Amino acid sequence: MSRFAAAAFFVLFGLTVCFADAAAPRVLPEGKQPNDTRLAAPKDLNGYFPLVMPQSKEEWAKRADVVRRQIAVAEGIWPTPERTPLNVVIHGRIDKGDYTVEKAYFESVPGFFVTGNLYRPKNKSGKVPGVLFPHGHWNDGRFIDIGRQAVRKEIVIGSERFENGGRSLLQALPVQVARMGCVCFHYDMIGYADSTQLSFELGHRFAKQRPEMNTTDGWGLFSPQAEAHLQSIMGLQTWNSVRALDFLLDLPEVDSSRIAVTGASGGGTQTMLLAGIDSRVTVSFPAVMVSTAMQGGCTCENASCLRVETGNIEFAGLFAPKPQGMTAANDWTKEMATKGFPELKQLYTLLGAPKNVELFANTHFQHNYNYVSRAAFFGFINKHFKLGVEEPVVEEDYDRLGRTELTVWDVTHPKPASGDDFERRLCSYLAEASRRQFDALQPRDGASLAKWREVVGGAVETIVGGMLPAKSDLEIADQQVTEAGNHTRFTGLLKDKSRGAELPAVLLQPSNWNGRAVIWLS
């Protein structure tokens, strides 16, 4: 410290300040902690995640930008990754009379494939709406078949209508969407159906660390290196959704002004996140997911830094004021009508579009995307896309396709590489691609410095939970003044009102102060 001719010490510390030659001055009694939100019990996915209502449109616009950036940073897609060639393959067209079904796959990043089925209407001219359909944690995903006995039980309680079509709730939706005159891409969640490059166990059941994947070079997901690089299953799924939207919009018949995304459960998570960060989506319909309660019970729905001082209600709010519908059931969404949705309605009202948000609460059903919930979606897009289908829109039965008819892989289109080595290569590629982007941002002049601060500074702000508080947010509480010979000691609690932070602090000011200061953080 000899380089500083300082005689004033401003000391910030957790509980006490330690000096070698004197008893440590205390701000709080022994054993008492500051009333700091960061010292509270950690909030887990089953906590309470309400929306804090903004007071003005301007306040919300600023907050929305912060939350969108937080999502992107947490998911490792900040700045937006390079959009590499999709290398689209569409094959195996099946004609079902009034619609067709095709097998489609493409690369979201080089060597990593998004797989699914493309449903298209027949006998349509001109541009038609496009619908993205990510699915949740339904057994076998896109290939789901709940069987004859199970669907009969669903029919008895009014959850499904048809014994054949009801066996696949996931196939029923895109069929009806195509019959209504829309193109629908139904794609796999990582680890489901044809998306097997990263396994189901890795993506959705990870619980035990793998020493062989926790290396400083050639690491895998869920490792310290992957977390440090913000690489996650959730980030990969979100990027898959962004590229699925690229794919959909590249289809010549799709109307870019009428793009919807819908999914239930984990598919609802994917829906609200894509709709929240990608402005190209014009209608969003997350089913049985948006709530103030449980935020997503799978590793694929969580990422480091994601839900810090935010949650799913606010994520859904990012889509306002554009049309958004959602469903509730007898699950964690059962209280949406009184907790969460009223605040979303207030937000839409603030933004001048109170009629653009709707909740379809069918809490007499368990967790679902059943016939009744699908009907709500069909009516919603019929209204907002002006499809002209007679109301009420009634879903009809269809000829259900099996696994062999839906799978994208065959002798001519073999499965791509998978397993641990592929996982290592994927993580390595993502890290190197990100490094190239940040290297390109190195400031060279005033304009590039501003961009560096926006991108890199923005990432740092998200990761550390904010930057310097405004002066107006700071105050000293419980201040005490003690004369101690050649100096005066001030103690108190330095409060940051904007974050609920509270730091014990000591200020030592000499009698003959020279106007210079040293800050000691301990």
Each model region followed by its residue ranges:
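The feature captures the conserved acid-bearing segment of alpha/beta-hydrolase catalytic domains
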Residues: 295-352
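Loop/turn elements at helix/coil->beta-strand transitions in domains of secreted/extracellular proteins
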Residues: 127-130, 180-183, 255-258, 279-283, ...
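Bacterial N-terminal signal peptides
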Residues: 7-17
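Flexible loop/turn segments at secondary-structure boundaries
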Residues: 138-141, 192-196, 267-271, 291-297, ...
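Alpha/beta-hydrolase-fold serine-hydrolase catalytic core, especially in secreted/extracellular enzymes
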Residues: 20-114, 327-504, 508-518
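Cap/lid segment of the alpha/beta-hydrolase catalytic domain
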Residues: 126-127, 131-242, 249, 290-300, ...
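Positively charged n-region of N-terminal signal peptides that target proteins for export
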Residues: 1-4
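Primarily recognizes the serine-hydrolase "nucleophile elbow" in alpha/beta-hydrolase
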Residues: 236, 243-308
